[in-house]
Amino acid sequence: MKKILISLMIIPLVLALMGAGVYALFSDTEAATGNTFTAGTLNLQVGSADPCTDKVTLSNIKPSDANTAATWLVKNLGSLAGSLDITVGAITNNENSITEPEAAAGDVTTPGGELGGLLKVAFWMDADKSGTWTSGDYYLKSDGTKVVWASGSTLPAAAYDLVNSYPHTWSGVQAVAATTDAGNFRVEYDFPDSGAGDNVAQGDSCVFDITFVLNQ
């Protein structure tokens, strides 16, 4: 009986020791601390400053004048790639005043001016910033389409149209990688000499906005 009692006492002790052995196995603990999610950035710069301060300001233009009105570097300063949209806004034609030659040419109405119906402009992206029409370049056609370089080194005449023809948005014209530029956006103008009828635009001005949007 005494042996049986001792045996019964030994069994729980053995079980306890076995349990202690299970919980005494090797272990190691690691913790990943300070986990952080950070949003990327899209930051578009057009021209010499961010936000944009550049604009086209031309005065005293006359029939037969043609030149570059603006050259603006378009750059994605952000950490994310984006898709570029460009919009030429509504055109406002200002009469400003009617000179004697204007009246003689038949311009007797105010406040709308006639310059936007005579002056031609072209908007194009000089992707490699070479200053010439080359591979990778494109222009924004007044019908809302994008026309890419196919041949030649001179911007095609078809790139130009009357200012009044342009209000439009061109969507997704170019993918712009993070911290890279899209190229130089150039504004060209041409004031064709069509004779005495051009007098109706004397002193007139046309005003519009060009908006650049970088989308994810």
Regions found by a protein language model. Name each.
Residues 2-63, 202-216:
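Short, polar/proline-rich extracytoplasmic segments that appear immediately after membrane translocation
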Residues 36, 44, 51, 55, ...:
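Short linear motifs in intrinsically disordered/low-complexity regions
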Residues 45-47, 89-91, 122-128, 139, ...:
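Predominantly extracellular/luminal cell-surface or secreted proteins
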Residues 57-58, 131-184:
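Extracellular adhesion/glycan-binding regions together with long Ser/Thr-
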Residues 62-95, 164-216:
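C-terminal, structured domain-capping segment
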